[in-house]
Regions:
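Charge-rich, low-complexity N-terminal segments
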Residues: 1-120
Length: 120
């Protein structure tokens, strides 16, 4: 069974060693989906959505929201951001009956990166 929760945050960045619009400072409203794979425990839940929300907000959203991403992720491409997010969540979101399965990060409504467990 898969359990997912979506989040939004705003941040600014620029892409280094890139020739185009994205080399200049600009911002995005990012959308993040975090998915766990697991088996419901005795309480019927893979993981309480409240716990999932708390972990993602604390480890990712509160760190990145309204930040200059290059201070946190030097080459802040969406691909590198997804990998950074995975590293922040991998340990806290792996329990006895569930594991971090997928991170999807949208930079725009039509452009996104998907990172899955098998790619780690």
């Amino acid at each position: 069974m898969f359990v997912s929760k979506d989040f939004k945050f705003d941040a600014a960045h620029n892409i280094l060693d890139y020739h185009g619009k994205c080399e200049s400072l600009h911002g995005h409203t990012y959308r993040l989906r975090v998915t766990l794979r697991g088996t419901p425990a005795k309480d019927g839940m893979v993981l309480d959505f409240t716990i999932l929300k708390r972990e993602v907000k604390e480890k990712v959203v509160d760190v990145l929201d309204h930040s200059y991403l290059n201070d946190i992720i030097p080459q802040s491409t969406t691909e590198n951001m997804a990998q950074w997010i995975w590293k922040q969540l991998e340990s806290p979101l792996n329990g006895g009956n569930y594991e971090l399965w997928e991170v999807i990060l949208w930079e725009t409504d039509t452009s996104f990166v998907t990172l899955r467990r098998e790619e780690q």
